[in-house]
């Protein structure tokens, strides 16, 4: 991406992906605007986002979002807003559909107004591997059938399809089909962060056991800053398209647990982990792994392998536990 010549709008800028993306774009000299739906968080600001203009805006409010897009006139829009929790989508399915699905359409419509007025604008939707449901073939590509099995996946699938509609209409509209991606900023409601924290506490003698759900499901685990960089690459591509963002390396939760304990020099981990079937999620795909060949052809590649990723997450939690005294 050429340095310093874009006006960027990122929805969900205070989330994991939005935070890393905003920092990367601001460091490159771009004018960066970001939204969050919680007015108190916008007012409080974020020390890590110096130079980023924060706005209170909600994808549920079509008129307010439309006004913001018209005022900022972004040349690039990244829609990263909304909960990324599959588990939460089961308890709040209508809200998930409204924010993740219809909310994306509200933003697409606002972007279309800029496009229709002759203004250059490129749009990226943060899609998800959950749109593929429990796929029959691996690895998945951009052509894998869309067949979601969760409310989260269904909402993301609708947004994904609407991006294609606006692309066919003539707008530069893209999707980044994101597989699991982690960082020290990931909330502990997600399994990778939960494991990293639990292992750090066990290593420090703070607890004896780590309780998890199904540890035999497999996922393609990546590093969030790499995936933020991938979104930059996608919007800088010569043509709009859909792009799988993945490492191509499928590892089970069991593998993740073992690697996390290795990071604190504990090999005999089985006795320290309990599996609770009450924590199993309904309709959880057994295996998801992506083929990012289309994205790699643009020059992108992940910077970390699986072991290095897990080590970074665990070391961050070891430091956090130590700082708590």
Task: Label each residue range with its predicted role.
Residues 49-61:
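Rossmann-fold cofactor-recognition segment
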Residues 59-99:
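NAD(P)H-binding glycine-rich loop region in Rossmannoid oxidoreductase-like domains
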Residues 91-109, 118-125, 130-175, 182-186:
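Catalytic helix-loop patch of NAD(P)-dependent Rossmann-fold dehydrogenases
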């Amino acid at each position: 991406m050429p340095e310093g010549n874009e006006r960027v709008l990122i929805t969900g800028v205070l989330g994991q992906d939005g935070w890393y993306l905003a920092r990367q774009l601001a460091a490159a000299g771009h004018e960066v605007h970001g939204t969050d739906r919680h007015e108190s968080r916008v007012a409080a600001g974020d020390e890590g986002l110096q130079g980023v203009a924060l706005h209170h805006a909600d994808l549920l409010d079509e008129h307010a979002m439309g006004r913001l897009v018209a005022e900022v006139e972004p040349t690039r829009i990244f829609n990263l807003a909304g909960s990324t929790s599959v588990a939460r989508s089961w308890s709040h399915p209508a809200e998930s559909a409204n924010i993740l699905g219809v909310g994306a359409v509200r933003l697409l419509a606002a972007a279309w107004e800029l496009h229709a007025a002759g203004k250059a604008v490129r749009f990226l939707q943060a899609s998800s591997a959950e749109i593929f449901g429990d796929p029959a073939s691996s690895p998945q590509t951009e052509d894998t059938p869309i067949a979601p099995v969760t409310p989260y996946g269904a909402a993301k699938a609708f947004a994904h399809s609407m991006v294609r509609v606006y692309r066919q209409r003539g707008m530069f509209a893209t999707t980044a089909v994101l597989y699991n991606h982690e960082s020290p900023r990931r909330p502990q409601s997600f399994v990778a962060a939960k494991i990293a924290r639990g292992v750090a506490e066990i290593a420090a003698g703070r607890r004896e056991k780590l309780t998890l759900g199904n540890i035999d499901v497999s996922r393609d685990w990546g590093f969030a800053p790499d995936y933020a960089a991938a979104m930059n690459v996608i919007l800088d591509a010569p043509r709009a398209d859909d792009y799988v963002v993945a490492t191509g390396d499928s590892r089970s939760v069991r593998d993740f647990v073992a690697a996390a304990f290795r990071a604190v020099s504990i090999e005999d981990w089985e006795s320290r982990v309990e599996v609770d079937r009450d924590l199993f999620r309904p309709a959880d795909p057994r295996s998801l792994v992506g083929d990012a060949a289309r994205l790699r052809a643009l020059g992108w590649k992940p910077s970390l392998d699986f072991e290095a990723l897990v080590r970074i997450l665990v070391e961050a939690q070891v430091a956090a536990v130590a700082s708590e005294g």
